[in-house]
Structures are given as structure tokens and as C-alpha cells.
Amino acid sequence: MAIHYFFENSKKPKFITASWKKLLKAVTDDENHKLRNVNYIFCNDEFLYAINSEYLNHHTYTDIITFDNSERPKEIEGDLYISLERTADNAAKFYVTHAHETARVMIHGIMHLCGYKDKNPDDIAIMREKEEYYLQKYFSEILD
């Protein structure tokens, strides 16, 4: 099991700690997936915009892009790019802390690696339900 943090054009916030890795591993365990290798690459808006444009042909800002590198069912490997500028803006918009919103987005990426989608209203509702469930179950004590 390996979760790695990398920072591109972005400074590491104090709230992102090694202990979060255990909590994210617990999420994958609850979803009956084996965590192999997940890289969280934290960056700024422009860095993620460039990735979104180049690889997905989307010319918009986003909070996360998940690249699923899994080779076997129920085994998780991937690269998750997260804009800390976008999570900070969204935190203010949703009246939550930056740590809370970043944890939610990190869980969101894990849910994608577990096979959840968010392209239609029903899928979005399921994704939001999962995010909230795992935020409450594993992150509530450290985010309060």
C-alpha cells in the first residue's frame, strides 16, 4: 500500500498530514478494494488547467482530475491531481474549512478509482453520499 503526496507549483498546507493516508486506506478497505499505489499531486489552478486542456480537451478550471492506472479489478492505482487554489475557493463557497474541502476532494478521487462516476444526476448523488459518509466516518474528528 502506498499513498504519496507531491506538490507542483503549490505549497504544502499544514493540514495535509501522513495520518490522512491511513484514513484514505480505510476508505478503500470499506469499498473492498486493495490500495496499490496512489499519487496525490497538489498543484495550482494553472497547472491543473493545462492538464485538463491537454489530456481531456476540457478548457475549464476544476478541483480534481483522476487518472486511473489500475490494471486489475478491485486494485487501485492512480494519479490524482488536485488544485489547492480551487479547493480553497470551493471551501469559501460552501462555508467549510479548506481542510474539509480538500479531504472531500481526495475522497472523491478515491471513489473514482473504486469505479464511481459523476456524469449524470443519479451518479452525482451517489458520489456525494459516499463523500459525506466517509468524511463523517473517518475525517470528522480531525476536521472539527
Regions found by a protein language model. Name each.
Residues 1-103, 114-144:
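An acidic/histidine-cluster motif and surrounding catalytic segment
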Residues 111:
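Conserved ATP-binding N-box helix of the HATPase_c
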